[in-house]
UniProtKB/Swiss-Prot annotation:
InterPro entries: AAA+_ATPase, MCM, Mcm3, MCM_CS, MCM_dom, MCM_lid, MCM_N, MCM_OB. This is DNA replication licensing factor Mcm3. It is found in: Nucleus; Chromosome. Its main location: nucleus.
């Protein structure tokens, strides 16, 4: 029987040699073998579809009797390789064959992998949950006997080998005569061995049931081909191993999959960039509005949030990481926090980043612990040793971590990511393990305010409720509000309804939709000829899907092209220009020195030295979007605009009850007067006190303005509004207030050149007077002495206002103090 089995293997080996030697036909696999030899690889990937066309009987036998067929195919490959390159065949003891293509009903999931597939070749898809350490497995040991001076060798096989009879695993220590043997480790042959565990994809698991898993055995060149969290497609032979309990073999068996090919289904592995793609990206980068086009193409199904999309684009592009000669690391990763009301598409923006970024790890605040985000110390089941398991942020090294429900995390777990967000590494010192792991990732987090919804009558710090040490590590913090506006609501509702009405053009009438469609399904049966098709640059316009939110001439980049553009743009390393450096330094010093001069504006996060690095990173990301080698002043201004939008938030005052009309009776006036006198002065608006002339009780008549529907709750300009013009903003002013409002107008704008001349003349007046303070009237008359172009009253008022804002002078009771 053994002779017949060996003869059968030799017969089918000749058929496989004929399949590989196809130079007279198309020469596909003859060329693949030559490429394998040139790359010094040990594994040839064969498409099952090609084998079905040329030799259907062997293809059927390969799927049903995997062990013998793979053994014969491997020998045939070595035989054919020895004819092409004899030296290469002698160098490698074994050559391996991997398979891909369509496996029909043998394309299964871990749940459907039952005993009927034992001995068959199957294709399994799943998510890698656990990866063991790589350990050497002995293939052939060489032993030397000092007494007889003879050398003997022994081969080892186990149940994971394709040989029929497994050998013992013990090393020989004595020969037949009882002489001691010495193992020659340098002459012995070992192979790498690793085990994986893949779990059923959650979208393919039946409703209400937990996903199942299967163990995978990888040898030689298949080790370290994937990491935990990867979606993989593994082809291999399904085999059972006997289970032992107490030294006896039980009736139940343990099943494993002996892998021969591992394909990654993640976005990063399938990113094939050609020379044409690079030229197309460079051509597109020459457009003046490339940054707006890229940001508009981010999550086009979400209406609005233009600044948030620009920030997410900067996060995907990133800054330039610097390692100084003394070892100091300046991070280039950009961190963004989205906080705001429910139903403003925060989680949907995170979901889009997961589909766009080359490497992105999703997690939630409540479902993640501190060690789950960084690293955990576990016990190896095989050896019992303590080992490290990487967390989400370590797995997302050089990628993005998306944390939803960030406010639901406990303070202890939230503190664990402080080191990662700034230093880009995780330091572990526990259970006798001292290690430092790289976690150079960007963090995109979404959270709800402390009160569930954003309270506009409280400061941003009170609404956010996070520590300053954590907030300063976020480069940008956006407050996203659900503002009631009939026009905007109408546009959003029209946009959402059109998306729900949309149907795929390829969908037939009455065709049932698949329940478990996923990104991996679309790649399961893709042939190699279809993978290299050109990527569409723009999305096709659909009147039903896009509707009023997008005109026909407006263009949106496709998701596939966005991935390629971001990947190419991240290779650029722009350098800061002198003008950009000066603009960034001036803006940072202004942010540090400026207090909240407006009574209704507060900062969303503290201004620290990290803010300066934020401006640099955002400027660099904007330059990368243009694929520029240098950071210009336009890039710096774009970064400043983003920071201005994200750092300041308007705070509204509580509505005060207005006084009743005077003809309603004196009793009502007295009651109102008592109520106003009992009100704390701290609750009184500064704007109200400034707008009133005297200390008359009519100051209570003035109500703060209601929030405008079109107001984006952001400070639109860098210069704050002067206190004198506040009365113009009051709603429904009385006749007395109208007189105040008409008499006080906004100061005239003064140019920078005239402002510098005014500063020089003012310094001269203070030097001549040898005083630290001068009356404003004296300055007004003396400032124009000897001047060829006298300053107007409006220019003087504007200059004093500008210098007061810059903390250069202080005005009190019409006296100017020099700071």
């Amino acid at each position: 029987m053994a002779h017949e089995g060996e003869q059968f293997i030799k017969d089918i080996q000749r058929e496989y040699v004929d399949f590989l030697d196809d130079e007279e036909d198309q020469g596909i696999y003859a060329g693949h073998v030559k490429d394998m030899i040139a790359e010094k690889s040990k594994r040839l990937i064969v498409n099952v579809n090609d084998l079905k066309r040329k030799n259907p009987q062997r293809a059927l036998g390969l799927l049903s009797n995997a062990a013998d067929e793979q053994l014969a195919f491997g020998r045939a490959l070595k035989e054919y390789a020895s004819t092409v390159d004899p030296g290469y065949a002698k160098m490698h003891e074994d050559l391996f064959v991997g398979f891909e293509g369509c496996f029909g009903n043998r394309h299964v999931t871990p749940r459907s992998l039952t005993s009927i597939y034992l001995g068959n070749m199957v294709c399994v898809e799943g998510i890698v949950t656990k990866v063991s350490l790589i350990r050497p497995k002995v293939v052939r040991s060489v032993h030397y006997c000092p007494n007889t001076r003879k050398v003997m060798e022994r081969k080892y096989t186990d149940l994971t080998s394709f040989e029929a009879v497994p050998s013992g695993a013990a090393y020989p220590t004595k020969d037949e005569d009882g002489n001691l043997l010495e193992t020659e480790y340098g002459l012995s042959v070992y192979k790498d061995h690793q085990t994986l565990t893949i779990q059923e994809m959650p979208e393919k698991a039946p409703a209400g049931q937990l996903p199942r898993s299967v163990d995978i055995v990888c040898d030689d060149d298949l080790v370290d081909r994937c990491k935990p969290g990867d979606r993989v497609q593994i082809v291999g032979s399904y085999r059972c191993l006997p289970g032992k309990r107490g030294g006896y073999t039980s009736g139940t068996f343990r099943t494993v999959l002996l892998a021969n090919n591992i394909s990654l289904l993640s976005k990063e592995s399938n990113l094939d960039i050609s020379r044409e793609d690079i030229m197309l990206c460079k051509k597109l980068a020459k457009n003046n509005d490339i940054f707006e086009l890229l940001s508009k193409s981010l999550a086009p199904s979400i209406h609005g949030h233009a600044y948030v999309k620009q920030a997410i684009l900067c996060l995907l592009l990133g800054g330039v990481e610097k390692i100084l000669p003394n070892g100091t690391r300046l991070r280039g990763d950009i961190n963004v926090l989205l906080i705001g009301d429910p139903s403003v598409a925060k989680s949907q923006l995170l979901r889009y980043v997961l589909n766009t970024a080359p490497r992105a790890i999703p997690t939630t605040g409540r479902g993640s612990s501190g060690v789950g985000l960084t690293a955990a110390v576990t016990t190896d089941q095989e050896t019992g040793e303590r080992r490290l398991e990487a967390g989400a942020m370590v797995l997302a090294d050089r990628g993005v971590v998306c944390i939803d429900e960030f406010d639901k995390m406990s303070d202890i777990d939230r503190t664990a990511i402080h080191e990662v967000m700034e230093q880009g590494r995780v330091t572990i010192s526990k259970a006798g393990i001292h290690a430092s792991l790289n976690a150079r990732c960007s963090v995109l987090a979404a959270a709800n305010p402390v009160y569930g919804r954003y309270d506009q009558y409280k400061t941003p710090m009170e609404n956010i409720g996070l520590q300053d040490s954590l907030l300063s590590r976020f480069d940008l913090l956006f407050v996203m509000l659900d503002v009631i506006d009939s026009d905007v609501d109408q546009m959003i509702s029209d946009h959402v309804v059109r998306m729900h009405r949309y149907r795929n053009p390829k969908e037939a009438d009455g065709e049932p939709l698949s329940m478990g469609s996923s990104y991996a399904d679309s790649l399961s049966f893709v042939s190699s000829s279809e993978e290299k098709k050109d990527t569409e640059v723009y999305e096709k316009y659909d009147a039903l899907l896009h509707g009023k939110s997008r005109q026909r001439h407006e263009k949106i980049l496709s998701v596939e092209f966005m991935r390629k553009y971001i990947h190419i743009a991240k290779c650029m390393k722009p350098k800061l220009g002198e003008q950009a450096c000066e603009a960034i330094a001036n803006e940072y010093s202004r942010l540090r020195s400026q207090e909240a001069v407006e009574t209704d504006v507060a900062r969303t996060q503290p201004i620290t030295a990290r803010t300066l690095e934020t401006l640099i990173r955002l400027s660099t990301a904007h330059a990368r979007a243009r694929m520029s080698k240098s950071v210009t002043i336009d890039d710096a201004h774009a970064a400043i605009e983003l920071v201005q939008f994200a750092y300041f938030k308007k705070v509204l005052d509580k509505d005060r009850p207005s006084k009743r009309r005077r003809n309603s009776g004196s009793d009502a006036e007295d009651d109102n007067g008592e109520a106003s006198s009992q009100r704390s002065p701290s609750r009184r608006s500064k704007r109200t006190r400034t707008a009133t002339v005297g200390a008359d009780s009519d100051e209570e008549d003035i109500e703060p303005p209601q929030p405008d529907a079109g107001d984006l709750t952001r400070r639109e300009t860098r210069r704050s509004l002067p206190a004198r013009s506040v009365a113009m903003l009051m709603a429904s002013p009385s006749s007395e207030e109208q007189s105040v409002a008409t008499s006080t107008t906004e100061p005239a704008i003064i140019s920078d050149a005239r402002l510098g001349e005014f500063k020089n003349n003012l310094q001269r007046l203070f030097r001549e007077a040898r005083e630290q303070s001068l009356a404003l009237a004296r300055i007004t008359t003396a400032i124009n002495v000897g001047s060829q172009e006298p300053f107007t009253a409006g220019e003087i008022e504007a200059a004093v206002h500008r210098m007061t804002e810059d903390n250069q002078i202080m005005v009190a009771d019409d006296i100017v103090f020099l700071i």
